[in-house]
Design a protein with these regions (language model features):
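Beta-alpha-beta core module
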Residues: 68-75, 79-80, 94, 140-193, ...
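Short beta-strand-to-loop elements that line the ligand-binding cleft
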Residues: 37-44, 63-64, 130-141
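Short helix-loop hinge/linker segments at domain boundaries
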Residues: 1-10, 30-32, 66-74, 93-96
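N-terminal winged-helix
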Residues: 2-33, 37-42, 46-50, 119, ...
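Short, well-ordered beta-strand segments
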Residues: 8-12, 60, 84, 108, ...
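Secondary-structure junction motif
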Residues: 106-128, 196-198, 204, 211-220
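Short beta-strand-centered segments that line the small-molecule binding cleft or hinge
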Residues: 24-28, 45-81, 85, 122, ...
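Hydrophobic/proline-rich hinge and linker segments of small-molecule sensing/allosteric domains
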Residues: 72-112, 182-196, 206-212
């Protein structure tokens, strides 16, 4: 019976997923499973993999595929990358973006250590040119990337869920990619030994059910979150 699932459960979440996804499911989960003592920690992917292997984390929400033999992955959703472009930009007039439009030299990036940054770099690899004179900036938050884009310092790419929190005026600066849209795969990951699988199942079911109403994108191409 659902009501009898209980005990401590340690969940890791990567920083680029935590602020948008956690508020969507946390209240529902706690209400439905009051006996589970959920401990949540924001961790990068490397830390998550290590802690799952060491048994210090029961599960995590991360960008996949990670191709790690110790870890099982269950897809929660596919989250498209969305262009956020200032008004004075060469791509401002484009209704939909192509991957070939991207230029790493005018792209504002998250700082090193974020798998979303590695995904963007993998996306830009195809047409990579390097020009040392260009202004380059890396930041720890999407909020800062949005502010700098608003100042005309370049363009950036945002995960779709993050775009839902933008102000109405800022929404006008979003440019979607033509299908199949580049996207990241976000999964619930856990050790292959499947300890606490009942709680993992419960978590997967609740998040999948909630996210279905927010993200309906199916025609996507998955961009690897691993630095190449």
């Amino acid at each position: 019976q659902k009501g009898f699932i209980g005990g401590e459960f340690k969940l890791g979440i990567i920083p680029t997923v935590m602020p948008t996804l956690l508020p969507m499911f946390l209240k529902t989960f706690i209400k439905r499973y009051p006996k589970i003592k959920l401990k949540i920690e924001e961790l990068n992917t490397e830390e998550i993999i290590q802690r799952i292997k060491d048994g210090h984390l029961d599960a995590a929400i991360a960008a996949t595929p990670l191709k790690n033999e110790h870890i099982k992955e269950r897809v929660l959703f596919y989250e498209p990358f969305v262009g956020y472009i200032p008004n004075n930009h060469r791509l401002t007039s484009k209704k939909t973006l192509e991957i070939s439009d991207l230029d790493i030299n005018d792209m504002l990036l998250l700082e090193d250590g974020h798998c979303f940054r590695d995904g963007v770099l993998n996306l830009c690899k195809a047409n990579k040119t390097s020009d040392q004179n260009e202004f380059q900036l890396e930041s720890g938050s999407f909020e800062m990337l949005v502010k700098l884009t608003n100042e005309g310092m370049g363009m950036t790419l945002l995960p779709y869920l993050h775009t839902l929190d933008l102000k109405e005026k800022e929404q006008e600066q979003l440019h979607y990619f033509s299908e199949p849209s580049p996207a990241r795969e976000v999964s619930l990951i856990y050790h292959k030994s499947e300890l606490k699988i009942q709680i993992i199942d419960a978590l997967h079911n609740i998040i999948s059910g909630i996210i279905r109403g927010a993200i309906a994108f199916q025609n996507v191409q998955i961009i690897s979150p691993i630095a190449t």
